[in-house]
Amino acid sequence: MANHVSSYISFSDISEEAENWLDKLMPDYNTAVYEVLGKIYDKTEAEMDNWEWWNENVGSKWITFEDVSCDGVSTISAWSPPTLFYENLYKKLSSLNSPDLKMWVSYDDEMPNFVGV
């Protein structure tokens, strides 16, 4: 079984447009992971459904979203922090009239083998 890595993402200097986009990203807890990722990466589930894509674009074997709102994002991923996901989320939010966006991420492994900010 994979070690679970919890990530907590917060923002400052985020535009109203980006806040609204985040609030609509995961309308409820039944929202599929591929639906959330599809909005961030502008991809279909078929385009994202392979190990190579996950490795090159998310940085972990899988990811789940525990909470998504303009107040922050919390995720759980397998084996490692999804650093490439963080980068792509930042790029997406910056493109939504948030040129001064600041994003903080903290993560920890359940063992704990590692932690980071």
Stretches found by the model and what they are:
Residues 1-117:
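Long, contiguous binding/interaction regions
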